[in-house]
UniProtKB/Swiss-Prot annotation:
Stretch list, region 30 X 5 AA repeats of C-C-[IRQVEL]-[SPTR]-[STVQRCP]: 20-173
GO cellular component, one term: cytosol
Protein name, as recorded: Keratin-associated protein 4-6
Positions of Sequence repeats: 20-24, 25-29, 30-34, 35-39, 40-44, 45-49, 50-54, 55-59, 60-64, 65-68, 69-73, 74-78, 79-83, 84-88, 89-93, 94-98, 99-103, 104-108, 114-118, 119-123, 124-128, 129-133, 134-138, 139-143, 144-148, 149-153, 154-158, 159-163, 164-168, 169-173
Protein's job: In the hair cortex, hair keratin intermediate filaments are embedded in an interfilamentous matrix, consisting of hair keratin-associated proteins (KRTAP), which are essential for the formation of a rigid and resistant hair shaft through their extensive disulfide bond cross-linking with abundant cysteine residues of hair keratins. The matrix proteins include the high-sulfur and high-glycine-tyrosine keratins.
Source organism of this protein record: Homo sapiens
Family designation: Belongs to the KRTAP type 4 family.
Amino acid sequence: MVSSCCGSVCSDQGCGLETCCRPSCCQTTCCRTTCCRPSCCVSSCCRPQCCQSVCCQPTCCRPSCCPSCCQTTCCRTTCCRPSCCVSSCCRPQCCQSVCCQPTCCRPSCSISSCCRPSCCVSRCCRSQCCQSVCCQPTCCRPSCCISSCCRPSCCESSCCRPCCCRPCCCLRPVCGRVSCHTTCYRPTCVISTCPRPLCCASSCC
């Protein structure tokens, strides 16, 4: 029984035995739960029932194996799903839009497809992530100060740039030393009691 099962041809009778868990027995018809071992992790055995933690190898990284195979060695583009967004899987090849979670917000993951509000943490604030949907107080940094991010929540002192000098940014005392209620809408923005000169653009005076 063992010899007939662990040969080149696998039958359904005895393929699930632990004694059959050999590389020669890792056929498509022999992929059982009991056969899910590292030596059996070939491409033909990559099925949901074979996606155990011990069988998480790069050759087994397929969509059907995510999320139970979200290990460092199984972080592939095909495995980039929200359930797979653990810290060990935060790599550039896993930074797809469907895999953009707070746990994956790392500098290496800061690509344009990952610019979502859930990914707007301080360590993910880069220029390519400064879109209008990603303009949060935690992302208000000089590198994030582009025109699309000019909102009241992004008008902090560290983000006070000419491109961010808009009327919506002149409503709170965050763009200078004093309040911007009245002095920011006047041509006399260059006096000492008003905000910084670089915040006194024509659109903000």
